[in-house]
């Protein structure tokens, strides 16, 4: 359990007091933290002065509700910044995570702002799935008294760019809501668009929302604030890589690395279920190849965020080189008048396919042109950190953080290519080398608060990572609840990630059951969803006993296939029709008994 606090400007504690509080709670288990929380709440409620100072409930006056639907933290940061802007304007505002929002109250909202990202094939973030499903169901209410605005974050390298925001925007209007502002669809480089949009939202709401008393605006504005740390995406910790171990066999088609990073005395804290953000540098050899293909030298001065840098340095540290997009292909075609690429312009499907199959450097190789350095920089997108599900618990590893990295490797016409962050960690950071990292907290993927609750973990491939953290935590807490793992990969002998650890947990009785699916070890392919169906009766018994279900891994295929298998198990062994099974699984999601970390 992580203490949740508002931004430093709103903290009632000074930095020294906050440090003492964090130090005092570092070694407490989730159960102990919950008790301490209750203890202080009891102390507070025994003090009449504290009660007298409590502001009136926000429900007594209408205000603004911001719903944050975030997958990687960007949407949450935009929502929090908007909340702070509205508080500064002395407006009554409430910020709530989509997963905590009681969506049946949406009909009573007068002023509603939705900030959402998109995942997978145009799907809403995990924490917003239940709200999305409700709004698109027959149960959705009319919203004639609701004015709304939507800010949508996405990645134009994907086909269904900002689809979740488009869905929310169109459905809220269809239900009778009034658009305060047109929807904004923001790409990876979203900050400028978000800043402009926030200013327009504040202006639009000043004339429509009541001004709150300072105590009320602060109290409601701090609702569901997530975490605080001296380190963040924009101010990462410079840590050191201590272990880089290949954990797939010599003959495996996959290169999977177990990476351990030493956090030193930074005090950086995380929980099982969180992700590690990794800032990486592009391969100097890739930078050199791209520069030479464009007949540049690499020492040309370019401007990056107001600073003048040599082109080589800018490309290595500041720009995305390993992920192509339809926009880049289209802009390069138009800029260079390429005879090969111009026929693709205007055809979205062909542009998407070309971008997905042709890295930027090979696009330039196949369609050579001469660009000046600034034109190249303007063509590219800013480099963004990669997120990896954390594979460790600090209850066991203390000042370390572990991740499980599937290294992306492929060939383009005989030339070896690799993923930016995965090859950085696997190939280019030496032992004790520097790695810039931060924690991306994920409160939508948490172990049950009750240690007696059974846990079902479904994680093929590198989706196994958070469940290693879960088991370390359950073992450290001596949690009596049962644990069941479903894992799959191509081959038993080559791809059984962390095999010795799982066998030890089984022997010690910590891991109650383990079901394994090896897709290439026999004639018929077997996947984790097949194992779920095979164990349907027992799975249903666990669910009836209150088990929490966790899924981690590929969003596009695996997660959908697993969900379909779960629906079939619920329908068959729960005696339900398809609609009732879907409703049952939706209720599990709302109750936080069905959680997914998919990508």
Swiss-Prot record:
Domain FAD-binding FR-type, which positions? 234-448
The record's free-text note on cofactor binding? Binds 1 FAD per subunit. Binds 1 FMN per subunit.
Which reaction(s) does its UniProt entry say it catalyses? Answer: hydrogen sulfide + 3 NADP(+) + 3 H2O = sulfite + 3 NADPH + 4 H(+)
GO biological process terms, semicolon-separated: cysteine biosynthetic process; hydrogen sulfide biosynthetic process; sulfate assimilation
Keywords assigned by UniProt, alphabetized: Amino-acid biosynthesis, Cysteine biosynthesis, Electron transport, FAD, Flavoprotein, FMN, NADP, Oxidoreductase, Transport
Q: Which GO terms describe its molecular function?
A: flavin adenine dinucleotide binding; FMN binding; sulfite reductase (NADPH) activity
Q: Locate the coiled-coil region(s) and give their ranges.
A: none
Q: Does the keyword Transmembrane apply?
A: no
* Cofactor(s) the record lists: FAD; FMN
Q: Where does FMN bind?
A: 70-75, 117-120, 153-162
One GO CC annotation, please?
cytosol
> What interactions and quaternary structure are annotated?
Alpha(8)-beta(8). The alpha component is a flavoprotein, the beta component is a hemoprotein.
Q: Which NCBIfam families match?
A: cysJ, PRK06214.1, PRK10953.1
Q: What does the function comment of this entry state?
A: Component of the sulfite reductase complex that catalyzes the 6-electron reduction of sulfite to sulfide. This is one of several activities required for the biosynthesis of L-cysteine from sulfate. The flavoprotein component catalyzes the electron flow from NADPH -> FAD -> FMN to the hemoprotein component.
Q: What is this protein called?
A: Sulfite reductase [NADPH] flavoprotein alpha-component
């Amino acid at each position: 359990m992580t203490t949740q606090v508002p931004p430093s400007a709103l903290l009632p504690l000074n930095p020294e007091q906050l440090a003492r509080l964090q130090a005092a709670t570092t070694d407490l288990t989730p159960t102990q933290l919950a008790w301490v929380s209750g203890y202080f709440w009891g102390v507070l409620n025994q003090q009449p002065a504290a009660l007298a100072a409590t502001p009136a409930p926000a429900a007594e006056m209408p205000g603004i509700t911001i719903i944050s639907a975030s997958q990687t933290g960007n949407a949450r940061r935009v929502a929090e910044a908007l909340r702070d802007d509205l508080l500064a304007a002395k407006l009554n505002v409430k910020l709530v995570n989509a997963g905590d929002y009681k969506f049946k109250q949406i009909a009573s909202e007068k002023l509603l702002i939705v900030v959402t990202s998109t995942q997978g094939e145009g799907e809403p973030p995990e924490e917003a799935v239940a709200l999305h499903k409700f709004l698109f169901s027959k149960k959705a209410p009319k919203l004639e008294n609701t004015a709304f605005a939507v800010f949508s974050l996405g990645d134009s390298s994907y086909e269904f760019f900002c689809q979740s925001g488009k869905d929310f925007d169109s459905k809220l209007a269809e239900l009778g809501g009034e658009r305060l502002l047109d929807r904004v669809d923001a790409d990876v480089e979203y900050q400028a668009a978000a800043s402009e949009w926030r200013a327009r939202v504040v202006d639009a709401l000043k004339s429509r929302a009541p001004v709150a008393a300072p105590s009320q605006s602060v109290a409601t504005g701090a609702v569901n604030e997530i975490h605080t740390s001296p380190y963040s995406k924009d101010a990462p910790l410079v840590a050191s890589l201590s272990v880089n171990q290949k954990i797939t066999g010599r003959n495996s088609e996959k290169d999977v690395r177990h990476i351990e990073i030493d956090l030193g005395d930074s005090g950086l804290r995380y929980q099982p279920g969180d992700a590690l953000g990794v800032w990486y540098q592009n391969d100097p050899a890739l930078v050199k190849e791209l520069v030479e293909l464009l007949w540049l030298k690499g020492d040309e001065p370019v401007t990056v965020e107001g600073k003048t840098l040599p082109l080589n340095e800018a490309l290595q540290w500041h720009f995305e080189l390993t992920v192509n997009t339809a926009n880049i292909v289209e802009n390069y075609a138009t800029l260079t008048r390429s005879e090969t690429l111009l026929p693709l312009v205007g055809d979205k499907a062909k542009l998407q396919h070309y971008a997905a199959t042709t890295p930027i450097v090979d696009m330039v190789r196949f369609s050579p042109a001469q660009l000046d350095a600034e034109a190249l920089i303007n063509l590219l997108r800013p480099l963004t950190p990669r997120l990896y599900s954390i594979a460790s618990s600090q209850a066991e590893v203390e000042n370390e953080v572990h991740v499980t990295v599937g290294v992306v490797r492929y060939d383009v016409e005989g030339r070896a290519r690799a993923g930016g962050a995965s090859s950085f960690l696997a190939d280019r950071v030496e032992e004790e080398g520097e790695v810039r990292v931060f924690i991306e907290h994920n409160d939508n993927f948490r172990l049950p608060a009750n240690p007696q609750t059974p846990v079902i973990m479904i994680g093929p491939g590198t989706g196994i990572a958070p469940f290693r953290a879960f088991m370390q935590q359950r073992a450290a807490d001596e949690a009596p609840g049962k644990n069941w793992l479903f894992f799959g990969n191509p081959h038993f002998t080559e791809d059984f990630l962390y095999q010795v650890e799982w066998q030890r947990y089984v022997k010690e009785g910590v891991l109650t059951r383990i079901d394994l699916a090896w897709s290439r070890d026999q004639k018929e392919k077997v996947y984790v969803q097949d194992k779920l169906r095979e164990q349907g009766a027992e799975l249903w018994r666990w669910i009836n006993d209150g088990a929490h279900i966790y899924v981690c891994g590929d969003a596009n295929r695996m997660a959908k296939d697993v969900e379909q298998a779960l629906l079939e198990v619920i329908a068959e062994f729960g005696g339900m029709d398809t609609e009732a099974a879907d409703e049952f699984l939706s209720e599990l999601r709302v109750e936080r008994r069905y959680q997914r970390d998919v990508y």
